Amino acid sequence: MTTRSLLLSVKIAIAAYVSMLLLYVIGSFTPGFRTWGFNWWAYFGAFTPWVLLALGLILAGYLYYSGRLTDTIPAQTDDSPALPARRYTIVSLVIVLLFGLTFVLLHTRTHFLGDGYNILTQLETDNPLVKITSIGEGLLHNFTKNALSGVSDSALLSFQIISITAGIGFVIVVLLAAGALFKRLTDRIIFALGLLSGGYGLLFFGYVEYYSVFVLSVGIFTLVGLLIARGKLNRWWILPCLALSVFLHVFGIALLPAVVYLLVSDTPAGRKLAGLPAMAKWAITLVVALAGITLFLYLYNASYAFRLAFVPLLQNRFTVDGYTLASWQHIRDLLNLWILLIPAAPVLFILAVFLPRTAFKGRDMAFFLVLALSVLAVTVVADPVLGMPRDWDLFAFAGVPVVAMFFYLLVNNRHHVSGYPAMSVLAIALGFFVLVPRVASQAIPDKGVKHFESYLTRNRAVDNKARAYLVEYYRRTRDSVGELKAKNLFRRHNTEGNLLGQGLFLFSEDEYDQAAESFRQALITNPRSAIAYTNLGKCYLRFDKPDSALLFQKIAIGLDPYDPITLNNLGLAYYYNEDYPHAECAWYDALARDTSLLTPRLFLMRQYRKLNQTKEFDSVVVSIADRPDLPVPALEDVGMAFLANKRYDKAGRIYRRALNLGMDPAKIDELKKSHPLLVVPPR
C-alpha cells in the first residue's frame, strides 16, 4: 500500500469518526423518533451534546495536527522481543480493578430495559420461572438467589452480583486472550480496550436480565476460536465453549457454523472438500441448504412458539404495526442496534477497505467472517418481542464477535494503517462516547425514567403495557405520588387491558358472544396478546367448537409458553377434543409452573374418573383433600374417593365442609344408605 493511499484511508476514517459524532448530536435532538441507538446524549441537558462533540473533535484535531494520525509505521517482523510477563500482568490488574470498580459504582438503579422489572418480580417468587430458552442463566440466578436467602432484596442482588462478576470475567478473558495473541503492549491494550468499548458492556453494570453470562460465554467462544484458528489451542476446545453458550441461551446455536468450520478446516476432509470442483461444492451447498429449509419449514408449521420467534417476511395475523423483515421500522431498528453494539464499525470498516487482500486470508479471518455473519443473521430474523429498543439486550451477544473481528483486523494489520495507535484511540473513543452515557442513564434514576418514557410512544401494542413498569418502579422506590400518577397513565393508555377486562366480565356473566368480540377487539389493538387468544379459546369451547378452541390455545401458548393459566386452558381444549394424553401433559405443565393452582388438579380428577384411572384419580384426591379453597363439586368428588377406599372418617370431614358451603343434605342421606359407616361430624 502506498503512502498516499494510507493517508487517504486515514482522512476518510476521520470523516467517518466526525460523522458519527454529528450523528450522536442529531440523535440528541430527536429522542422521540426511532433514533434509540444513537440518541443517548439527549438525556443529560442541552449543553451535554455540544460538550461531548467538542471533546471528540478536540481529540481528533490534536491527533491529526500533531502528526500522530499521519505517521506511517515501518514494516516490522513478528520477531520483536516478547513483553516481560510481569509488566503486562501489572497493567492487566490495573485494568481489571478500574473496570471492576466502575461496574460496581455505576451499577444500574433502574431496570426498564429488557424485561427487567418483570423478571425481577418473577425471581422474587417462591417458584421462579426457568425458561427453556435460557436454562443455564435461569438456574444460575435461582441458585444465587437461594444462596442469598435471608438477605434483603436477594433477587435484585443476585442479578447484580452475576452481572458484575460476568463483567469482571469478561475483562479477564479479553486480557488473557490479548496476551496470547500479541507480543507488543500497545497491541494488547488496543485489542482489549476495543473489545471492552462495545455496546454490550452495559450488561455488566448490574443489569437485570438473563444475558450477562451468556455474553461472557460468547466472548470466551470467540477468543478461544480465534486462538484455535491461529494454531495456539487444540480445535476440540471449541466444543465445551459451544456447549456452555447453548446451555446458557438457545441463541448459542448461532455459533455452530463457526464450530463446524474450525473442526473441518485444515483437516484431510476439509482439504478434500476444498479441492472439489465448483459444481460439486455448489451441489453440497444446495443439499445442505435444502435440508436446513426443510427442517425450518417443518418446525415453522409444527410450532407456533417457533414461528412467532421470527420476524415475519410478510404481514400476517400476528404482525404488530406492520413490522416485517422488509419494513422500514425493522431496517431502522437494525441500524440502531448495530450502531449501539458496534460504535466503531464505520471507522474500522473504512480502514479495512484499504487493507490489502492478504489481510483477509487465513483461518482466523475465515472463522471471524463465518461467526460474524451467523450472529448478525440472528439480529435480522429473530423477533424482538418487547420491541428492539428495549429488547436490544437479547441481541447484545452478536456485538462481541463483530467488535473482536474489527479490532483484530486493525491490530493484526497495524503496519498497513497510518497512525495506527492514534486511529485506534479514535475507534475506542467512539465506543465509550456511547457506552458511558448509556451507563449513566441507567445509574441515575431520573435519567432512567426520562429515557424509558421516551420509548412509550413507539410501539403502541408493546409499550402501552410497559407503562406498568413505571408503576412498579415508583412502588419499589416508595414514591406514592409517582405511583398514583403512573397508575392513572397506565389505565388511560392500556386499551388492550381494558378490553380484556371487559371480555372477562362478560364471560363471567355467560355473555360469550359479547366476550368473544371484546377479545377480538383486544387482538386488533395487540395482535400478539396471549391473554386474548386463550380467553377467545375458552369462548369457542362454549360455542361447542373444540377444534377452533384448541387452535386459539396453541397460538396463546406459542405467544406465552410459560403461563400456567394458558397451559391449563390448553389442557381443557385437548380434553374436549378427546386428546387425553396431551391434556394430561398440559395440566401437569401448568402445575410445574405454579404448584398452588387448583383448577388443573380438578380437571385431572375429571379426566381420570372418566377414563377409570383409579390410581391416578386417588393420587390427585390425596394432593388436594386438605386445601381450603375446594368448591362443593370438588369436595363431593374427594368424598366419593375416600368412600371408595373405605376411609369413612376423612369422607365425613370432607362432607361436613361441603355442607357448610351449601351442599344439599339430602345427598348425604342417600350416601349413608350405601355407606352406613359414614359419619358426618356436627357443624
Residue ranges of predicted features:
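Canonical tetratricopeptide repeat
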Residues: 501, 535, 569, 603, ...
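Short acidic/glycine- and proline-prone juxtamembrane loop motifs at membrane-interface regions
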Residues: 114, 203-213
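Transmembrane signal-anchor helices characteristic of membrane glycosylation enzymes that use polyprenol
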Residues: 12-31, 47-66, 84-113, 285-303, ...
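Transmembrane-helix signature of polytopic, membrane-embedded enzymes
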Residues: 174-197
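Membrane-interface alpha helices of multi-pass inner-membrane proteins
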Residues: 219, 235-250, 256-260
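Extracytoplasmic catalytic/substrate-binding loops of multi-pass membrane glycan-assembly enzymes
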Residues: 105-121, 128-144, 153, 157
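Transmembrane-helix motifs of polytopic, lipid-linked glycan transferases
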Residues: 161-182, 220
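Membrane-lumen/periplasm interface segments of specific transmembrane helices
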Residues: 258-262, 279-353, 375-378
